[in-house]
Amino acid sequence: MSLRKVPRPFDLHWGKGVIAEEASVVTPFHEPTIQLLAFDDGSKSLRFCAYHKGSFARMPLIVGEEHLKALAKELKKSPQLRKLLKKLVD
């Protein structure tokens, strides 16, 4: 469960906007996170990332099978994020 507030701003080279929703789970090693990025131009993107000791980690997202249930539980609190993720498996 993330302690970071949403929405909060982000600024990338190709656009800026807000992190509209976020689902994460704390593990012994890092905090796997899925974010809904809502750009100022109205477009939306998913970001699969991780945090380490509270800081954004520049590494690929790796989620152990034993943490998927907890991450799924957190995703239930983020309806827009779930809607986009369903497009990956439907």
Regions found by a protein language model. Name each.
Residues 13-15, 40, 62:
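Intrinsically disordered, low-complexity segments enriched in small/polar residues
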Residues 28-59:
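A short, structured beta-strand/loop element
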Residues 21-22, 37, 66:
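Compositionally biased, intrinsically disordered low-complexity segments
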Residues 16-18, 43, 55, 65:
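Intrinsically disordered, low-complexity regions
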Residues 2-3, 7-10, 52-90:
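Mixed-charge, Lys/Arg-enriched low-complexity segments
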Residues 1-29:
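Negatively charged, low-complexity tracts enriched in Asp/Glu with abundant Ser/Thr
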